[in-house]
């Protein structure tokens, strides 16, 4: 009698991938020729459990997708910047430090209003 054993390969979660993906994306952002998909404002309550609006710099879409989300005060100054890595029902984010190049890039894109 032969017994068959099935081994399921677990795909890594977004939480396991987010730091590596952010490192790769930072390299992309150093290239002046790099073109992201979109830059727009996501109003509060656009999505469930999203009370605060944010500026979104979207790099890729679908599964997986990734983006920067800048949360600003009433003077359009960033008070929090997050990098999100998302993939079909899973997602993870990390806080981007204020001294990161991406912070300055987002400030330029948002600009004074």
Task: Go through the PLM ranges and name each one.
Residues 1-50:
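Long, contiguous N-terminal structural blocks used for assembly/anchoring
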Residues 3-8, 70, 93-96:
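Hydrophobic transmembrane signal anchors and adjacent membrane-proximal interface regions, especially
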Residues 24, 57-59, 63, 86, ...:
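Intrinsic disorder/low-complexity segments enriched in polar/charged and small flexible residues
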